[in-house]
């Protein structure tokens, strides 16, 4: 929407801050709701507060407690700046409260990912790979991978893949992966992992 193009998180942050500031200056706004914990979310949150506007964070209070993860840094910054925290559950409320958020600014609204799945369930189509491989509904495992840190820790990832394949037994594993993740997984898979099926994102 803002026309930001980059794979570098710091460049994304800078571009979003610049373009979102321009957007807010051209459009009268009282409050901004930011969603999730991406670099663009953090950038929009910072700009919102610098403009003196009300900031609400949807999916607040989520923590991995691993400060080496870029998203964890984003979460801490966004929640720290927010005037209103919309959380997914009681455990998220507890995190927000432990970090000093006033009870009056924390609202448990549920998990928007689950809400989206329920609301769009009728639009889902049966993945083509099921028919191609003769796989019955409900008789498969889905595997996905998008964390750069996990892809970089190749030995850990390889052990994880081996453990998943062993635990799955004869149950097929369908892995909808983006190109980079697919390349990494392909390099690390055991040669006899014939039931591990990589496909394009669905």
Please give the residue ranges for each predicted region.
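Active-site and donor-binding regions of nucleotide-sugar-utilizing enzymes
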Residues: 1-102
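A nucleotide-sugar donor-handling region in carbohydrate enzymes
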Residues: 3-4, 81-155
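Donor-nucleotide binding loops and adjacent catalytic segments primarily
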Residues: 125-202
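Residues at the starts of beta-strands that form the adenosine-phosphate
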Residues: 54, 105, 172-173
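Short, acidic/turn-prone active-site loops that include or flank metal/cofactor-
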Residues: 60-64, 111, 200-202
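Conserved active-site and cofactor/substrate-binding residues in soluble primary-metabolism enzymes
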Residues: 11, 15, 73, 91, ...
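Short beta-strand segments
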Residues: 35, 57-59, 109, 144, ...
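Phosphate- and divalent-cation-binding pockets in alpha/beta enzyme and binding domains
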Residues: 43, 95, 116, 183-185
């Amino acid at each position: 929407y803002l026309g930001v193009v980059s794979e570098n998180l710091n460049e994304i942050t800078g571009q979003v801050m610049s373009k979102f500031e321009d957007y807010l200056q051209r459009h009268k706004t009282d409050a901004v709701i930011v969603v999730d914990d991406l670099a663009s979310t953090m950038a929009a949150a910072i700009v919102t507060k610098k403009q003196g506007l009300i900031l609400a964070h949807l999916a607040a209070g989520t923590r991995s407690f691993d400060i080496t993860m870029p998203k964890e840094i984003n979460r801490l910054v966004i929640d720290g700046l927010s005037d209103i925290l919309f959380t997914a559950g009681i455990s998220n409320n507890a995190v927000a409260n432990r970090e000093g958020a006033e009870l009056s600014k924390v609202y448990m609204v549920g998990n928007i990912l689950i809400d989206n799945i329920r609301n769009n369930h009728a639009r889902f189509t049966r993945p083509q790979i099921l028919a191609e491989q003769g796989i019955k509904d409900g008789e498969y495992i889905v595997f996905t991978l998008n964390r750069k840190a996990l892809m970089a820790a190749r030995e850990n990832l390889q052990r994880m893949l081996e453990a998943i394949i062993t635990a799955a037994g004869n149950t097929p594993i369908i892995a909808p992966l983006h190109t980079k993740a697919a390349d990494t997984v392909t390099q690390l898979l055991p040669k006899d992992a014939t039931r591990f099926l990589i496909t394009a994102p669905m």
